[in-house]
Amino acid sequence: MKVIFMQDVKGRGKRGQVKDVPNGYAQNYLIKQGLAKEANKCNLNTLKRVEANEKAEYEAQKAAAQEIKKQLEADETVVELKAKAGSDSRLFGSISSKKIIEGLDKQFGIKLDKHKLELREPIKVLGYTNVPVKLFKGVESKVRVHVTQEN
């Protein structure tokens, strides 16, 4: 019996895959557990539609990430932050990814999730810092952050 796997089944098939399996296994286990559906014309058309929607959504997310990358890599996109610092240019506190995200939103209207910033440790010195950003699978950029002394 041909079935369409709705979920990954170890040793049998992956989600969305159409495979031939024994009748008893398909009817008594896969279909009853909701792991697969019978591969008839209607279900195959539904599978094609779902795959097309997923691909379109993936492409839309990738295009949005590319647009944000363009904005981040523009010359004028530098996040300006102020912090109290000592005479040796070391900050009394630190600049976290949350503050960088807030600065991006306030200054440029770019909304990002703080988990997309790959800041290994908070910024603790005055000056310019490049912070890597992973926007999407295969789409990476850098945010330039300029920390100045607060009066």
UniProtKB/Swiss-Prot annotation:
Keywords: Ribonucleoprotein, Ribosomal protein, RNA-binding, rRNA-binding. One of its GO terms (cellular component) is ribonucleoprotein complex. PROSITE patterns: RIBOSOMAL_L9 (PS00651). One of its GO terms (biological process) is translation. One of its GO terms (molecular function) is structural constituent of ribosome. SUPFAM superfamilies: L9 N-domain-like (SSF55658), Ribosomal protein L9 C-domain (SSF55653). The keyword Ribonucleoprotein applies. PANTHER family: 50S RIBOSOMAL PROTEIN L9. Belongs to the bacterial ribosomal protein bL9 family. Binds to the 23S rRNA. This is Large ribosomal subunit protein bL9. It comes from Lactobacillus delbrueckii subsp. bulgaricus (strain ATCC BAA-365 / Lb-18).
